[in-house]
Every structure is written in structure tokens, then in C-alpha cells.
């Protein structure tokens, strides 16, 4: 099994559009034949709608992501006693300790194995859909650059330019900014 906590990786693995923001309110628990997304009540409706045709179960159970993972681990199929649970290399020490505690409370041995860029490696290979989206994003960026060059005037505050640039990109279809402007 594999536990994913990075929101960008969860978004890529689930292929959910316009569901997640930057808050770390989600955990994805993936097994060979099933996956569960643990989220909080603010996101559950959007996640359930996005998951309708996917082999993914959405849960908003009131428990920590670590407790959720421990519960899923306890319910793994017979014969999986020697299995491991991969965790992302970006998991914080605090999150790791919560996992240890939740698994101890569930009387489960620690099955954790650190992974190194598993999802990042998968994300590096682009399909036609992703390439089309990248081209669309580049078109928005090009148009925004042309607009902002014409918009700027001597004496303007940087903040004015920043807000105009961001607003232009969002008005023209950007879902957000790739990095702060």
C-alpha cells in the first residue's frame, strides 16, 4: 500500500480538477485494487462528485489521516501480513510520529517504508491530456505577459502590477498561479 499526503500528488493521482486547494486536508491510501481518499467535510461533496466514475472511495470520517491509514491497514486482505506501507519522503516528522502512534494504538506493527519521488517520477511522463493543459497554460501566460507589458506605466506600484497580472490570468482561465508573482 502507499500513503500519499502531498496535495499536488493526490490531485495528479486522482485526476480531480478544481477540487483541491493548497491546504493539506487530504490523504490518499492506495492499494493494488482500491484507493481511499480521506478528506474533511469542506471537500467531501466535491471529492465525491469527482470520484463518481473512479475506483476511489471518499471518506470524511472524523479522525486523523494517521488513524484513517491505520484503520485501512488493519483491514488489508489475508496473506498480506508481510506487506509494507510506502510513505512519501515529504512526510513531516510530526506526521510520521502520528502514524507511529495511530498504528501502535491499532496494535499494528510499523509497516512503514520511505519512498523517494515515486509519484514525482510518474508525473514526469506526460500524456496528451496533460500536454494540452500545459499548452493552454502557456497560452494564458503569453497573453498575460503581452497584457502586462502594455498595462505598466512609470510610477506604478509593484503591487498594482502584481494584482493586474494575477487577475488577468484568472479571468482568462488559469486555475491558480504556478508560483507567487
Place the predicted regions along the sequence by residue:
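Active-site cores enriched in adjacent His and Asp/Glu residues with nearby glycine-rich loops
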Residues: 1-10, 139-181
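A composition/biophysics-driven feature that prefers long, compositionally simple stretches
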Residues: 1-146
Amino acid at each position: 500500500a502507499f500513503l500519499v499526503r502531498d496535495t499536488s500528488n493526490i490531485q495528479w493521482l486522482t485526476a480531480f480538477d478544481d477540487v483541491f486547494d493548497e491546504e493539506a486536508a487530504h490523504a490518499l491510501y492506495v492499494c493494488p485494487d482500491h484507493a481511499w481518499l480521506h478528506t474533511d467535510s469542506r471537500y467531501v461533496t466535491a471529492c465525491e462528485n469527482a470520484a463518481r466514475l473512479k475506483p476511489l472511495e471518499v471518506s470524511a470520517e472524523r479522525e486523523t489521516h494517521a488513524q484513517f491509514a491505520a484503520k485501512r491497514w488493519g483491514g488489508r486482505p489475508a496473506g498480506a501480513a508481510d506487506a509494507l506501507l510506502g510513505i512519501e519522503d515529504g512526510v513531516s516528522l510530526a506526521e510520521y510520529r502520528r502514524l507511529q502512534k495511530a498504528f501502535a494504538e491499532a496494535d499494528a506493527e510499523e509497516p512503514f517504508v520511505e519512498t523517494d519521488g515515486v509519484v514525482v517520477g510518474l508525473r514526469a511522463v506526460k500524456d496528451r491530456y496533460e500536454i494540452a493543459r500545459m499548452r493552454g497554460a502557456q497560452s494564458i501566460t503569453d497573453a498575460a505577459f503581452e497584457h502586462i507589458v502594455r498595462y505598466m506605466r512609470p510610477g506604478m506600484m509593484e503591487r498594482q502590477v502584481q494584482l493586474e497580472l494575477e487577475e488577468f490570468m484568472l479571468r482568462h482561465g488559469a486555475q491558480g498561479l504556478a508560483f507567487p508573482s
